[in-house]
UniProtKB/Swiss-Prot annotation:
It comes from Neurospora crassa (strain ATCC 24698 / 74-OR23-1A / CBS 708.71 / DSM 1257 / FGSC 987). Disruption phenotype: Results in increased conidiation associated with stunted aerial hyphae. PANTHER family: DEVELOPMENTAL AND SECONDARY METABOLISM REGULATOR VEA, SPORE DEVELOPMENT REGULATOR VOSA. Induction: Constitutively expressed during asexual and sexual development and induced by red light, indicating a light-dependent regulation. A motif (Nuclear localization signal) lies at residues 45-50. This is Developmental and secondary metabolism regulator ve-1. It is found in: Nucleus; Cytoplasm. GO terms for cellular component: cytoplasm; nucleus. Its main location: nucleus. PROSITE patterns: VELVET. Residues 166-175, 500-528 have a biased composition (Basic and acidic residues). Residues 31-230 form the Velvet domain.
Amino acid sequence: MGAQVIAAASNGLCHDDEPIASVKSRITRSGRKLWYSLRVVQEPLRARACGSGPKSSADRRPVDPPPVVELRIFEGESFEMAQERDVTFQYNANFFLYATLEHARVMAQGRLQTPSANTPPVLTGMPVSGMAYLDRPKLAGYFLFPDLSVRHEGRYKLTFNLYEETKEDKDKDPEEPNAPPDGSPGSFDFRMDIKSHDFVVYSAKKFPGLTESTPLSRTVAEQGCRVRIRRDVRMRRRDGKGNSGGNDYENGEEEYRRARRTATPDTAKQEAYRQRSMSGSTERTPYSSISDPQRRPSMADYPPQYAAQTPTSGGHLGFLGGNTHHQYPAQPPPQSFAQPHSVPPSPVYPTSQRAPYQHQPSSYPPPPPPHQPIFQSEHHTSRTYAPINPASRHDSIHQSTKQYTLPPLSEAVSPTQPHHQHPSIAPHRLPVTALPPLQVDRFSSASHNQHPMVSPSNMAAPPYPRAYSVSNSGGLTSAGGYNQLPPPPPPPPQVAGSKRAHDQTFRADPEMRRYQDGARERESVDDKEPPLCTFKYRRADGSVECKQADIGGY
């Protein structure tokens, strides 16, 4: 072909920072001398191995950044003179660049030729690129490779081979003996090649990530070429370890600016959460246990409390002082309250208002213990229940030392009277148990003589027992501290499913045996049918008639 190559540029041994360039010249049929200048303006730096499995095409990363090769054509007797005449856009021909992959370091051939050593590195993607005529960054032709990938990790380099298809006969090579005739279809002629710098192909685990698109890639994409542009940084931490020096990323400053630019406060999460309900909590006030000792948690229900009413001398009741009988208010009918066993009974908080009942001396015998029955007169036939309202009870502060007579049971206070005027004593809170109805049949009238009238100051309300049971004599006795009612009888055994028992279907006759060898049950006298000598029938008026059967015809 009569091509001449400049040795200083064609060997490609340049500094890594400088782009590799290659220059080659040839003489056409018409005698023109053309100079081809091929230069890699954007070198590949890294790539991620995509493997060779069935899913290798689904998650494939291209070589980053995409290689870009520049081609310029000059015409002149020498290369220095030819640079003054650039004919890249005027030259009528088609060019394409074909990329191949090779190892950066030539592997020595070993004694054992393994298949992996003989297999060349596999390049996937689009290895062919046509020339694009662009104005920027220079008036030249550019070859772009935005879709090149490598299947195996290692250190490689790319080799770009330039092919030309001439359109005019004057621009073709001089005649050769073995050249095809002019009437043959067009062909591509190899012009030159150029190699890129070495780049590293990482595995999927060690791949540091794709970098931001270079200014050259953006410039080429702005002119209509199909190049992937990444405006965000996709760098991965090195070796999976943190670095206190702030160099976790290769471009830490760009990553920091990007993070600040894209950080947007989430206003949806700034809504105030609904406050937690404290209906059953003791954290209502900082001093809830001191200011409200009678407060009980809402999760446990306690039975109504009983109060011993002791009216004062200036009370509104008109019957005070008119009777010598004393009376204890009858207890209300029992009510069942469900309370979990894990809830302890409410503690009793002693206050200074109950001190007179606990420390004043008394000249009378102490009240009966909880297991003793409450004595009342025999002639009391009607009983009323003192209304209980724990919310309106008030502890009596001033206790009078005078003695008062209590009205008979028939003149007890009606439930409609107000309760805030009756002094009462806050009873002890007891664990909830189901109490049976109180039954009081008879009591000795002599018990009234043994217990004279006791003033409110000398009288202490006896604690109520936890559970009661009725004795044989009709009196009310205590069954113990935590005794419960007798358990209900066990339910009758249920037959599994809805099937009938065996005895309901078959006879349970001990004399019944298994019949074998054609044996049958012997007929009894009762089982034999009576002779058909007579028959009965009922007439229309309801009478029964008997008639002798005529069996003589047989």
